[in-house]
Amino acid sequence: MATNIANDLNIKLQYGVYVGTTGPTFETQAEYRYFKAIGGDAVGMSTVPETIVARHMGVPVFGMSVITNCGLSDQKGDHEDVQLQGKLAGERMSKLFVELIKQLYQ
């Protein structure tokens, strides 16, 4: 359902393997290389434990992440840029979630 809504809204989605870390830190280049070597596509810190708890309680889960920094790029990540990238994605994500909720409750 979310894929169809994203297509209708011209929102590009990517699919991949999410690597969960404890955070809150920027991972090292060595960690990013390791995560890539074991098949990881994206790294984050909160989705995994929240999903485990929700599934343990029998709650269905829909996960979506915004990639806010590229760990293996030449650019050094900083907190301000991560916040900016999240803010820029917020409008598209809001539209997607509003439509998803509308369709779930029709």
Tell me what each language-model feature is.
Residues M1-V66, C70, K76, E80-Q106:
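Glycine-rich phosphate- or other oxyanion-binding loops that anchor nucleotides, phosphorylated ligands
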